[in-house]
Amino acid sequence: MPKLVFARHGESEWNLANLFTGWADVDLSENGTKQAIEAGKLIKEAGIEFDIAYTSVLKRAIKTTNLALEFSDQLWVPVVKSWRLNERHYGGLTGLNKADAAAKHGDEQVHIWRRSYDVLPPAMDHDDKYTAHGDRRYAGLEDSLIPDAENLKVTLERALPFWEDQIAPALKEGKNVFVGAHGNSIRALVKQIKKLSDDEIMDVEIPNFPPLVFEFDDNLNVQNEYYLAPKKA
């Protein structure tokens, strides 16, 4: 029974500062590093052995993936990085304190931007200091593929080809898969995996820790879903 382990990146410096992050390439906080290490230890304790790992091109997810593999004694496992697993792009909200954004735009409007399935936040200008246009890690992409803002619907549309081309085939081959990604890219894939409605996915939260495990049958029907937890003494 193949397993898929989702690990949202550990707490980032901007999580700690309560800032909208999106595609901004911020680092893990000290606590986030500890969370990633603990994720690896939980994976080792659970006896889960991976055949392949996937992550985004953002350092907080890459570092979480590397630490989780290192502390589960699986640092040799191949890791594939893809922009399609990046966090949702928060557009012009990127870098703003969430409380300041609410004060400027109103609590209700910010809540809609954050939590609705298909409402886009304000677009990011191409000359914004956090723009992905011109960033070397996206040099191989057509400029039209680089977003200026995303909602969860668009995030799923971006992530879905990677699920269909990479992750799902690996699982169908019986491989155990690790995905180190982000709250909203994981939520998008969970919607696909569990066949959730647009309304149902809005109530799903993905914590920075611990990792989330799915077990599948040969047709990728979910047989079990659980968060890893320390074994009781």
Swiss-Prot record:
Binding site for substrate: 8-15, 21-22, 60, 87-90, 98, 114-115, 183-184
Site for Transition state stabilizer, residues: H182
Annotated catalytic residues: H9, E87
Biological pathway: Carbohydrate degradation; glycolysis; pyruvate from D-glyceraldehyde 3-phosphate: step 3/5
InterPro entries: His_Pase_superF_clade-1, His_PPase_superfam, Phosphogly_mut1
UniProt keywords, alphabetically: Gluconeogenesis, Glycolysis, Isomerase
The enzyme's E.C. designation: 5.4.2.11
Coiled coil: none
GO biological processes: gluconeogenesis; glycolytic process
Annotated catalysed reactions: (2R)-2-phosphoglycerate = (2R)-3-phosphoglycerate
CDD domains the record matches: HP_PGM_like
GO molecular function ontology, one term from the record: phosphoglycerate mutase activity
Family recorded in the similarity comment: Belongs to the phosphoglycerate mutase family. BPG-dependent PGAM subfamily.
Matching HAMAP family: PGAM_GpmA (MF_01039)
Protein function: Catalyzes the interconversion of 2-phosphoglycerate and 3-phosphoglycerate.
Name this polypeptide is given: 2,3-bisphosphoglycerate-dependent phosphoglycerate mutase
Organism: Lactococcus lactis subsp. cremoris (strain MG1363)
Lineage per the UniProt record: Bacteria, Bacillati, Bacillota, Bacilli, Lactobacillales
